[in-house]
UniProtKB/Swiss-Prot annotation:
SMART domains: S_TKc. This is Serine/threonine-protein kinase pim-2. GO terms for cellular component: cytoplasm. GO terms for biological process: apoptotic process; hemopoiesis; negative regulation of apoptotic process; positive regulation of TORC1 signaling; regulation of mitotic cell cycle. Belongs to the protein kinase superfamily. CAMK Ser/Thr protein kinase family. PIM subfamily. It comes from Danio rerio.
Length: 310
């Protein structure tokens, strides 16, 4: 387990949304409903805002599960790093505009000595990409291309704000099953973006690159590109390329599905063993496979018969 530490996040010129201490303040504004999911990060519940009935998702995190803390202007005590990152990406009442491809934090509350509650928008007709692939199987390349482009654009926005997600995977991507629009979720493993090496990692191991498995260090951009390569393989082949550490460090995916040469080329490029050989995000977007046309909204609506899980 990582040592608990305070991570300073630059949030200058933001109007910071301040926590309303105590559960009674939360209960005056929101109603918590059924459990949607749980894991090492905590639990997520459905809910709604009392003032207007807006549906929301509420993430409940116990204090003892929080590994990274941040100082925020206007707050006396450090807050969970995830809250600071989401605030700088346009969450709450801050002045920074958000991005359509990133889930928006609406509010947050501290229950002193116990937990934090983070309130998110709850897009309708959505399910995570993991379930989307599980129910549908391997995706057509045109649909995978469309999803990947949106994920990259969301990641680029994060990087422009000095933030790296560090846990890009199918479970952290919501798909609107009517329109094909996506939103990146769960910044619990995120960090401030820096040029130097990282020596901590709280993301998903099967999406992590060889340099982390072997040396427990990595740079943010090659790590992100590796995870995008795993994600693309997952979408077009129906499952992730590597399950074991020994396979990750070999960096040689096997293709059990018939996919185009250009798609295979992009996957292998992103999954290069040497971090320096991996493309940049801009180079991925300019790859011949990415330049091909994708399905439009109508095509997705016609094909999708999946019942949304959220």
């Amino acid at each position: 387990m990582l040592d608990k530490r305070i991570v300073d996040v630059r949030l200058d010129q933001l109007e910071i949304l301040k926590a309303k201490n105590g559960k009674e303040h939360f209960e005056k504004q929101y109603t918590m409903g059924n459990l949607l999911g749980s894991g090492g990060f905590g639990s997520v519940y459905s809910g709604h805002r009392i003032s207007d009935g807006q549906k929301v998702a509420i993430k409940q995190i116990s204090r003892d599960r929080i590994q990274q803390w941040s100082k925020m202007p206007g707050e006396v005590n450090p807050v969970p790093n995830e809250i600071a990152l989401l605030q700088s990406l346009g969450g709450g009442s801050g002045s920074v505009p958000g991005h359509r491809g990133i889930i928006r934090m609406l509010d947050w509350f501290e229950i002193p000595g116990q937990e934090y509650l983070i309130v998110f928008e709850k897009p309708q007709h959505c399910q995570d990409l993991f379930d989307f692939i599980t129910e549908r199987g391997a995706l057509d390349e045109s649909l995978a291309r469309r999803f990947l482009k949106q994920v990259i654009e969301a990641v680029q926005f994060c990087h422009s704000k000095g933030i790296v997600h560090r846990d890009i995977k199918d479970e952290n991507i919501l798909v609107d099953t009517r329109t094909g629009d996506i939103k990146v979720i769960d910044f619990g493993s995120g960090a401030t973006l820096k040029d130097s090496m990282y020596t901590d990692f709280e993301g998903t191991r099967v999406y992590s690159p060889p340099e982390w498995i072997l040396y427990h260090k990595y740079h943010a951009l090659p790590l992100t590109v590796w995870s995008l390569g795993v994600l693309l393989y997952d979408m077009v082949c129906g499952d992730i390329p590597f399950e074991q550490d020994t396979d990750i460090v070999k960096a040689k995916p096997s293709f059990n599905k018939r996919i185009s040469n250009d798609c295979r080329s992009l996957i292998c490029s992103c999954l290069s063993y040497n971090p320096g050989d991996r493309p940049s995000l801009e180079q991925i977007l300019q790859h011949p496979w990415m330049m091909e046309s994708s399905v439009d909204n109508g095509d997705l609506q016609e094909e999708s018969k999946i019942k949304p899980s959220l």
